[in-house]
Amino acid sequence: ASYKVKLITPDGPQEFECPDDVYILEHAEELGIDIPYSCRAGSCSSCAGKLVAGSVDQSDQSFLDDEQIEEGWVLTCVAYPKSDVTIETHKEEELTA
């Protein structure tokens, strides 16, 4: 299956279809969409975003705690879409503040 992903970036919204077995960051990059990242392994906060709608599987991540996940934080480098999703990107400063 694939789902509609909407990324709300500082440059405006970007929408694309993303297969449910491809990380959101990886697919965005293939489409030329610029999202920050560093480790690509779910163990830092560079790619952090805020889930506005929908759900993701980010079970490979090791950085966020349960409370942050409940608040809607998502690491796009290890997040698979599990429904149509809307994510605000470029949120690392807010997460680590």
UniProtKB/Swiss-Prot annotation:
Q: Show the GO MF annotations.
A: 2 iron, 2 sulfur cluster binding; electron transfer activity; metal ion binding
Gene3D superfamilies, per this entry?
3.10.20.30
- PROSITE patterns given in the database record: 2FE2S_FER_1, 2FE2S_FER_2
Q: Name one Pfam family in it.
A: Fer2
Key words, A-Z? 2Fe-2S, Chloroplast, Electron transport, Iron, Iron-sulfur, Metal-binding, Plastid, Transport
2Fe-2S ferredoxin-type domain spans which residues? 3-93
**UniProt-annotated binding residues for [2Fe-2S] cluster:** C39, C44, C47, C77
Give the signal sequence positions.
Answer: none
Can you quote the record's cofactor note?
Answer: Binds 1 [2Fe-2S] cluster.
Localization, UniProt = Plastid, Chloroplast
Write down the required cofactor(s). [2Fe-2S] cluster
Q: Name one GO biological process term.
A: electron transport chain
Superkingdom of the organism of origin: Eukaryota
Q: Does the keyword Amino-acid biosynthesis apply?
A: no
Task: Answer whether the UniProt record assigns the keyword Chloroplast to this protein.
Answer: yes
GO CC aspect terms: chloroplast stroma
Main function? Ferredoxins are iron-sulfur proteins that transfer electrons in a wide variety of metabolic reactions.
Q: Which family does it belong to?
A: Belongs to the 2Fe2S plant-type ferredoxin family.
Recorded protein name is Ferredoxin
